[in-house]
Amino acid sequence: MRGLSMLLRVLCVAALTLAFGGVAAGIMGKAEAAPYETLMVPSGAMGRDIPVAFLGGGPHAVYLLDAFNAAPDVSNWVTAGNAMGALGGKGISVVAPAGGAWSMYTNWEQDGSKQWDTFLSSELPDWLAANKGLAPGGHAAVGASQGGYAAMALAAFHPDRFGFAGSLSGFLYPSNTTTNGSILAGLQQFGGVDGNGMWGAPQLGRWKWHDPYVHAALLAQNNTRVWVWSPTNMGGDAAAMIGQAGEAMGNSRMFYQQYRSVGGHNGHFDFPAGGDNGWGSWSGQLGAMSGDIVGAIR
């Protein structure tokens, strides 16, 4: 069983470390010389086909979820995050959906075109099981920024599908009063999106239903392997972070405390002074966690 490792860093701040029915289009692409397929996976929930970069390698897969400014056709994990180079040849498959910009990869109450939780937790794994021979469950979800939130939420609420969750600069406490205001402001500023259409106005209380911090006990009870990385440096890709890197940093630390308080012991938490909230650092972290992912799901 994987234990919990601790690392204390003092570099101006203290950093704690605890050691997602149709025919696919077989378009071939390359990322760092690793060939992948672009699958068009039908989503009945969203009423359209979703482009998914797929690299076969085993029955269990890593689902890679993009930051807020996700590209419409090819995941930024493929074009900027070197996902295929980092994960190819390790005995696991790679699944990277595109088109999830400004969505938090959740089911929106007032926008039928954004039903990402249904797609990632049901439609996509079922389609991959039927068409690519993947296992129905036992996968990993890893994401940056909004994708970090979604990875943790998918693992918390769909443990039959996901046994590993990785969050890089993720918003892990969205129902926090300061955080929900920041998310709403950032969605409007960078995406022109009214975030109240997601889970309703924050004061109505439904944001808590979807919150990994509030439901951290589920991750602890299921012994889900978690990896959380968030730097103290506020620099990086502003659009990818909707200008709210500080909220992600604070959220990750509060999530760590909550996870520990409910008995969580199967996590890696790292809050370094180095790195930033952008693809150079996120790509490096994906490579760093690759062995951990393989050990958890292969």
Q: Predicted segments — roles?
A:
Residues 28-298:
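Non-catalytic cap/lid and distal C-terminal segments of serine-dependent acyl enzymes
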Residues 1-33:
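Secretory targeting and sorting signals
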